[in-house]
């Protein structure tokens, strides 16, 4: 296996950009080298003020990370707080940040929204 690949975290947003889904995630795929920052965006359905972020590690099930309601973090019990942070500003998309990515951050990240 190429050793350069081992220094990267691959972050996938499955289902991103599907017009029928209503929720838009971008970028669809993101590759970062170890130590770089990853920034994932989620634009909820129109009229929705709640956003939920989930992560699915390889060979594992979907796990809750954080629940936000416009500018407020309601529940972040599933989010590793050392390098991860999330926000949902009054205007604009919700953003999930991963600082100084490591190989173990390679996963599929999903967001969902509700009214």
From Swiss-Prot:
An individual GO BP term: adaptive immune response
Annotated protein name in UniProt: T cell receptor beta variable 18
Disulfide bonds: 42-111
Keywords: Adaptive immunity, Cell membrane, Disulfide bond, Immunity, Immunoglobulin domain, Membrane, Receptor, Signal, T cell receptor
Stored InterPro entries: Ig-like_dom (IPR007110), Ig-like_dom_sf (IPR036179), Ig-like_fold (IPR013783), Ig_V-set (IPR013106), TCR_beta_variable (IPR050413)
Domain Ig-like stretches: 22-115
The UniProt record lists the keyword Nucleotidyltransferase: no
GO CC aspect terms: plasma membrane; T cell receptor complex
Function: V region of the variable domain of T cell receptor (TR) beta chain that participates in the antigen recognition. Alpha-beta T cell receptors are antigen specific receptors which are essential to the immune response and are present on the cell surface of T lymphocytes. Recognize peptide-major histocompatibility (MH) (pMH) complexes that are displayed by antigen presenting cells (APC), a prerequisite for efficient T cell adaptive immunity against pathogens.
């Amino acid at each position: 296996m190429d050793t350069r690949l081992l220094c990267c975290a691959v972050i996938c947003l499955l289902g991103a950009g599907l017009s029928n889904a209503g929720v838009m995630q971008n970028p669809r795929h993101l590759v970062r080298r170890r130590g770089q920052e990853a920034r994932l965006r989620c634009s909820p359905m129109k009229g929705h003020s709640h956003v939920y972020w989930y992560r699915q590690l390889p060979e594992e099930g979907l796990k809750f990370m954080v629940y936000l309601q416009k500018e407020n973090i309601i529940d972040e019990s599933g989010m590793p707080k050392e390098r991860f942070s999330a926000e949902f500003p009054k205007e604009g998309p919700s953003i999930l940040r991963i600082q100084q990515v490591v190989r173990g951050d390679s996963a599929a990240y999903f967001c969902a929204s509700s009214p």
